[in-house]
Amino acid sequence: MAYLGVDTSRIAGTQPLEMLLVSSGSPDPHSTIIIDPRTGVSSWSYKGSELQGASTGLVEPLGHDGEHVVITTKERPLVHVLAVHPKDRFHQKCVLPGPVSAIVSDNSGHFVFMSIKRQLYCWLLSTGELLSVIDAHYQNITKIVISDDDSMIFTASKDGAVHGYLVTDLVSADRDHTVAPFRKWASHTLSISDLKITNGSNPRVLSAGADHIACLHSISMDSVILKASSDRPLTACAIDPAETRIFIGTEVGNIAQINLFQLAPEERDLLVQAGDEHNTKFRVLNGHSDEISRLAINTDGTLLASGDASGKYCIWEISSHQCLKVSTMRSVINTLRFIPFWKTISGGEHVAKFRPVWDLKREPTKCDRFAIEVSTEFNSDQKHWNDVIEETIDQLLLESGSKSSAQLQWDAEGPARNEAAKAEKAAENTIKNIITLGDDEDDAPEVGNQRRKSGKKNKKNRKNQKKNDFEAAVIEKKQVEPIVIDDEEEVNSSLQKKFDALKAENEKLKEINKQMYEFVAKEIVDSEK
């Protein structure tokens, strides 16, 4: 192991922003490691005891959190999933219809896409269901890539074709129609060895094949916008995040750099002599003596990682073309990618947010199972979990066409609501009749006679009479009010008894409903186990 031009003492105590995941196809222990690209120091390694002597195939992280990784076995239909955290002993394995040739996961880690021969499989990891299986190509699939927004998947195969699929079509529960690619490119005549996709809303797809050609495809234009022909078969490719540089690797270990910003607008077909070390137009990096198997560029486009078939991998500084680190492993480099710094690597306290169900089905299903995601924080409130279970069961009842618990409870409380409405209406009518009788209309003739008198005395008498009439009406109302209150209390007392009986019955139904939900939830959990 060699470190060239790096002062490791200055950066030894700082936390890196990104790490480098390296894996070789060797059955030896610690064939999968995670290193700091600045120093080359290994921060995590996988012993490989669960593989039982099988050679490591591909290594794919589930999501961007780095809680779990998927490891395939070379030439065997076995796929393993294990936890990255050193104290987490989670490990499961599954037998698939055949060896996996390519694998990719979405950013959440809930979906995984694998290729077996010429078919593309899509699994939902919260239940283990196989959502779809499509015949993507005429020959075996070699590479799968997914866009950074998880909306598109592109596949490459030995037939020289690149196909693009919408993720929504692959994960859809509709099995009545055949999933068709929305993009088809046949820009190669031989097998495609590598496939890369850029970031952003308008990504580009870079492919390299054994026909000595590398093609840059535009998804929006649905065409090839750049074609580079080499003097040697191409085995790997990479493009930086800014889409300014392209790197292509050959079968003899040379890496050619193409600066896109130096090309003229009319230059669409390039001839690259990757074997010429004195090439002035395209810079050639010479650090390998065997076939380049993997190329990767970090997030800011300053570092290039390369691995070959002999197990040697290098880290280059792109601006100066200087090799910063050289190391070797015991077999071909199958996985080489830059990853963000995972908190699970440090070994601190960590609780997994999600556990994949690795009982992967072999036949497509119709989403007849459901899952409740595990909460990251424990909630001891029993009412909270009862509400969660009730909401889940209500959703299932609505999907099946049945009434939910809220609708059943509303129907059960219907008679009580009708009785309450009738009682309220009867009480309003009683009060209205009593107020009408208290208006003291019997004194109207006397008041009318007094109004027919004239003079100031008559006016004063009328005022006094009105005042006396008003006081008499108030007194009469006060005398009647106790009778109204007594009648209302009798009505309310009768209604209160009915309400109490209905309330007790309602509480009893709620308790039965709660017991039913707890029983159903327990049955679901036991069936999952």
Curated annotation (Swiss-Prot):
Alphabetized PANTHER family for the sequence: WD REPEAT-CONTAINING PROTEIN 18, WD-REPEAT PROTEIN 18
Disruption phenotype: Worms exhibit defects in rRNA processing which disrupt hermaphrodite gonadogenesis and germline proliferation and which are associated with a reduction in sheath cell number.
Role description: Component of the PELP1 complex involved in the nucleolar steps of 28S rRNA maturation and the subsequent nucleoplasmic transit of the pre-60S ribosomal subunit. Required for processing ITS2 sequences from rRNA intermediates during 26S rRNA maturation. Required in the soma to promote normal proliferation and prevent germline tumor formation.
Main localisation: nucleus
Disordered: annotated span: 436-470
Coiled coil start-end: 416-518
SUPFAM superfamilies registered for this protein in UniProt: WD40 repeat-like (SSF50978)
WD repeat start-end pairs: 136-175, 287-326
Native species: Caenorhabditis elegans
Segments of skewed composition (Basic residues): 450-465
Cellular component GO terms held in the UniProt record: nuclear pre-replicative complex; nucleolus; nucleoplasm; rixosome complex
Keywords linked to the UniProt accession: Coiled coil, Developmental protein, Differentiation, Gonadal differentiation, Nucleus, Repeat, Ribosome biogenesis, rRNA processing, WD repeat
Location of this chain's protein in the cell: Nucleus, Nucleolus; Nucleus, Nucleoplasm
Identification of the protein by name: Pre-rRNA-processing protein pro-1
Keyword presence, Ribosomal protein: no
Subunit-structure text: Component of the PELP1 complex, composed of at least PELP1, TEX10 and WDR18. The complex interacts with pre-60S ribosome particles.
Pfam family of the protein (one): WD40
Similarity comment text for this entry: Belongs to the WD repeat IPI3/WDR18 family.
One GO term of the biological process aspect: gonadal mesoderm development
